[in-house]
Amino acid sequence: MLDGVARTMIVDKRPIIAITMGDAAGVGPEIIVKALRLKEIYDVCRPLVLADAAIISDVIKSLNSTLKLRRVRSSDRAKGEFGTVDIIDLNNLDRKEVIPGQICIACARAAMEYIARAAELAQQGKVKAVVTAPINKEAVIQAGYGDVGHLEFFARITHAAEYATMLVSGPLRVVHLSTHYSLKEACERVSKDKILAKLRLTHNSLQRWGINYPRIAVAALNPHGGEGGLLGSEEIEQIQPAVKEAQESGINALGPFPADSVFTRAIKGEFDVVLAMYHDQGHIPVKVYGFERSISVALGLPFIRTSVDHGTAFDIAGRGIASSQSLEEAIKVAVRLIEGKLV
């Protein structure tokens, strides 16, 4: 009571979402600034950027933006006020080392520090989701990390037993049996056990996000689905047995279907998700269908993580022409997943 009037504290129900800057020499800082100029982002969440504040400040100036930076020491200080970027400043870069469009070992190390901090906050429940801007895999390897991507790094530090990448572009969702392997290695990894594990992970993830009985189409590995063994035996020896066992356990797995038609069928609404056998088999249709709005969702981590579906784009870094659409969509999808709704 204050002067006889009960005062009720207004609780901000918008989730705090950690956004990592990625590689400072790429387009990450630029697309973050561009995305956070939009009120629609602040309408649904409280963005919290993990970055080097000096780099973000430089980009704000270069884009002639009116955004203001507010350094915060902890996630609970994020206010999510439109026009202001709440940032945990790791202060881990020297501007002189950052040359847009060039491999930068210091940038790679800094980027990994942002995502490690974001994972820590997510596991502590201090942020509801993590959204990542791109890192440069070549720079990350040169910096001494053995992880070839965000997902592998997150999986290692969280001890995730089974994990996968799901790309999303409108109605098209694609989970990958494997991603960062050579084509030869990817084909060698097509096995009944691996397929079955990914089917279970996909089924459970989509159920958790509101699709009660997900229809999972499994893509064939070989042309025309192998033509009964004439063009390869993986469908008969590995994929079909995995689909059959999944069905027997209550998973609505279907296929294998020829890869040249299954993605179109998914776009038309026949399936909820497609399980692709390797990186390019899944990435190409998603990016052809909707390159700028496609995003990545991690399956199997102990927290929600979404990402842009593009790289550091060194060829256009620092020029002010990068699109932030993928990042905007990644943030919005993260909010929906927090609410338990993939669609």
Predicted segments, located by residue:
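Contiguous, glycine/small-aliphatic-enriched amphipathic segments in soluble metabolic enzymes
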Residues: 2-150, 189, 193-277, 281-295, ...
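Short, flexible loop segments at boundaries between secondary-structure elements
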Residues: 157-172, 299-315
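Ligand-binding beta-strand-loop-alpha-helix segment within the catalytic cores
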Residues: 167-189, 194-196
